Amino acid sequence: MNRPIVLLVEDETSVVAFIQSALERYGYCVEAAASGAQALEMLRDRSYSGVISDMRTPGGVDGAGVWSWIAGHRPELLRKLIFITGDIVNEETAATLRRTCAPFIEKPFRVHQLISTLEQVLGQRQ
């Protein structure tokens, strides 16, 4: 059986290492993009089972920009995107979460929260 491939959009290397290690322990393959712009390049070139994106990333394309691109180019991934954020009180972040209806996890989070949410959006149980 092929392992699900998840695109992780996160610029903090310690968070990337934490999430990648956790997801790999649960049988996922993780490819990381350090910016929203890099994520869009990767989404153009490869298929993913799901996407986990930080709301705030450098390079001019944030989590909302990744969501918008997916909506226009890879709509099959819209319901398979999870936002992670440390800033839900920010009005722009809150507005994006309301507009997209995408599931989100607030930093800091526990591994079981991430795995449970990922299993829900991918429609599988580990």
Regions found by a protein language model. Give the residues of each.
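Acidic, metal-coordinating helix/loop segments flanking the phosphotransfer/catalytic sites
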Residues: 7, 20, 32-50, 58, ...
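Conserved acidic carboxylate
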Residues: 10
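Two-component/phosphorelay signaling modules centered on CheY-like receiver
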Residues: 13-31, 102
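Short amphipathic alpha-helix used as the core "switch/output" element in two-component signaling
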Residues: 41, 62-77
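Hydrophobic/aromatic residues positioned on beta-strands within the core alpha/beta folds
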Residues: 84-85
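As written
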Residues: 95-105
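C-terminal output helix
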Residues: 109-119
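The C-terminal output helix
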Residues: 119-126
